[in-house]
């Protein structure tokens, strides 16, 4: 079990399916767990950078995930382009592990605004 309070996943509004009967299996923009081999996750401090790099023009939903309820392996892997290690989930996200699914608003300049959606950086 991970010693962090939450993991995060950015989903496009069109990919987020509120059907709570199936585990969530979208890895990243338009790619499934089956295609990618894992689901891209982030720590709170990584979310805004991922959003800026990949989701700038998308309607986005922030999934907050309880790592204690994730049954598949989570592995932190270096992403040299980002200069950081990101959590990758090698299985689906159980719906019961998703604590919240919150649409991310846009600020006046059009960027995604995570104010109040993420804990303050440590």
Identify the meaning behind each predicted range.
Residues 1-122:
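Conserved, structured core segments of small domains
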């Amino acid at each position: 079990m991970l010693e962090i309070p939450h993991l995060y996943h950015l989903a496009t509004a069109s990919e987020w399916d509120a059907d709570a009967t199936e585990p969530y299996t979208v890895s990243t923009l338009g790619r499934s767990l089956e295609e990618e081999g894992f689901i891209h996750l982030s720590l709170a401090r990584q979310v805004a950078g991922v959003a800026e790099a990949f989701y700038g023009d998308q309607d986005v939903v922030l999934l907050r995930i309880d790592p204690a309820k994730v049954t598949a392996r989570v592995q932190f892997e270096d992403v040299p382009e980002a200069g950081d290690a990101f959590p990758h989930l090698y299985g689906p996200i159980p719906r019961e592990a998703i604590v919240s699914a919150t649409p991310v608003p846009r600020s006046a300049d059009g960027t995604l605004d995570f104010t109040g959606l993420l804990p303050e950086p440590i």
